[in-house]
Amino acid sequence: MSSRVLTPDVVGIDALVQDHQTVLAKAEGGVVAVFANNAPAFYAVTPARLAELLALEEKLARPGSDVALDDQLYQEPQAAPVAVPMGKFAMYPDWQPDADFIRLAALWGVALREPVTTEELASFIAYWQAEGKVFHHVQWQQKLARSLQIGRASNGGLPKRDVNTVSEPDSQIPPGFRG
């Protein structure tokens, strides 16, 4: 059995029991490796060295900077289970993507800045209900992510204009034209 001794000072357990103060006083660095039956048993440490080690441990336990990271970056909330049909199913009116849909979309290569609006979801559901195709829940979410990506990119990321609004004329005269 191999082991690593972390100090150059080694003593047998019998020698330590007979005169521990002298053994620790001669120890370089205030630490002695104590052997029993030719194997390391434990370390004997002087009170001064123990105080140094505890101070070092306390210093290392404190953060190195005053920047604190938000815990929610490390703790993902558990999504509440939703009754999703098993296997493949046709689109139905009450279908909803998962609560962590935006994160999942990012995993699929679709960066969505905003959550799905009710209008976008209603349009998606209406289209696919009419198609009558069947897919797994994850596949429906992937289709929704791609649909949102294409729909939002077609207008430069801006929401679609209402076709019923009356446009206002531009009253600015471009350079080079007379007014």
UniProtKB/Swiss-Prot annotation:
Keywords: DNA replication, DNA-binding, Primosome. GO terms for biological process: DNA replication, synthesis of primer. GO terms for cellular component: primosome complex. InterPro entries: DnaT, DnaT_DNA_bind. Residues 156-179 are annotated as: Disordered. Belongs to the DnaT family. This is Replication restart protein DnaT. It comes from Escherichia coli (strain ATCC 8739 / DSM 1576 / NBRC 3972 / NCIMB 8545 / WDCM 00012 / Crooks).
